[in-house]
Each structure stands twice: as C-alpha cells, then as structure tokens.
Design a protein with these regions (language model features):
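Active-site neighborhoods of metal-dependent hydrolases
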Residues: 1-139
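Short capping/connector residues at structural and topological boundaries
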Residues: 53-55, 165, 187, 203
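Acidic, glycine-enriched loop/beta-strand segments at the rims
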Residues: 87-98, 141-147, 155-192
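C-terminal cap of metal-dependent C-N hydrolases
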Residues: 99-105, 110-111, 126, 175-204
Length: 204
C-alpha cells in the first residue's frame, strides 16, 4: 500500500458518507512497522532491522542485509537461521504518514513490544514525536487537535468512560509537557531514549 493513502482515505470517506456512525482509524508517526520476522514482510520492505533472535541473540539491532552478507547467503536464508525472531520493516511512505495524520478521523496511538532486545522507538517516541515534529514543527494541526486525537477522541471512540478529558469526576490521567521543547529522542539506533520536554506523567 506504499503511496496509496489517497485511495485508502477516499474509500473510508465513501463509506462514512453512507453511514450515520463515523469510522475512525489509528495511525502512528513512523515509516516502519515491527512484528515477527517473516518472509512476506521482508519481501515488501526496503530495509529490515532485526529486533531479537532466539537462535542468534547477538545479531539483534543489525540490518538483515548485513547479516546475510556475513553469513554468505540471501536474506531469506539468513532470516531462516535467525528464527524465531522479530524485525522492524521500513516499508511506508512519509507522505502517506503525514496525509493520514491530518485526516480528522485519525486517532494517534501505538502498540509495542517492550520485551524486544532492540525495540521499535514508537514505545518511547510516538506521542512526543507527534507533538514536537508533526504538530509544532510541520504544523500539520493545532496543538489542541493533536492532544484530542491522543486522548478524548480515542476514549470516545472505544467507549472508555471517564477517560480522555480533564473534567470533574474523571480519572486524572495527566501529562505535563513544554510545548516549545517536547520532542522524541528515541530513534531506530537508540530506541529507548526518553523524550525531551516532558516534566511529569500522572495516572489515575
């Protein structure tokens, strides 16, 4: 689906126009995904970064192409030798990410695999990356809209009562950050760096 976000969003909008209930979808601010190591994902990726390997744990954090060269085989044989394993796949377009982020029905969020030896930076960087890079620097949307897409909109969509807003009798889930300095520091080489500009996180 690389480069096809216009078609995808048009399909969503066509279905939304014919229904009383809105359709929401989630997006995260990266051009790479992360899951188990498998051939069909390798086939469509420009780059593959190994996050963990049970059989060869010392190779976590390295590019699959480099591992294949070292093992003197193709990338599929290298993948077979690493199994079971996980990987990050660079297979998305930055233009698509920005277009989807700007859509009013897009919720911002992420899952993650924190047990990986070399995890995806989304675990540490998703929300500050949106607030700092896409909202403040690229000005894709106002700060208030960015916060709403991460909090109230998601809570409303999934029916999470008393969540997602600063309101009397609601659970006090609060992040205190500096809008001028907030930014992700985690990247694919150092994925566990704490974000900048976040002073405090309060839960319940």
């Amino acid at each position: 689906n690389f480069g096809r976000s216009k078609e995808t969003l048009a399909c969503f909008e066509k279905h939304m126009a014919g229904h009383h209930h809105g359709i929401a979808f989630d997006v995260y601010p990266y051009i790479a995904s992360s899951t188990v190591l498998k051939n069909d994902s390798i086939q469509v990726a420009e780059r593959v970064l190994i996050t963990w390997s049970k059989s060869r744990p010392e190779l976590a954090g390295r590019e699959l192409s480099d591992i294949a060269e070292e093992l003197n085989c193709d990338i599929y044989e290298a993948a077979a030798q690493l199994q079971p394993a996980g990987a990050i796949y660079f297979a998305m377009s930055e233009e698509d990410v920005q277009r989807i982020l700007q859509h009013p029905n897009a919720m911002i969020g992420s899952d993650g695999l924190p047990h990986d030896e070399h995890p995806h930076p989304r675990l540490w960087g998703t929300f500050p990356r949106v607030l700092g890079h896409y909202c403040r620097d690229l000005k894709l949307f106002p700060l208030e809209e960015a916060v709403r897409r991460m909090t109230g909109y998601s809570a409303e969509t999934f029916g999470l009562s008393k969540r997602g807003m600063l309101k009397q009798d609601f659970f006090a889930d609060i992040t205190i950050f500096d809008e001028d300095t907030v930014l992700d520091a985690a990247d694919f080489e150092c994925p566990t760096k704490p974000a900048k500009g976040i002073d405090c996180v309060l839960v319940n």
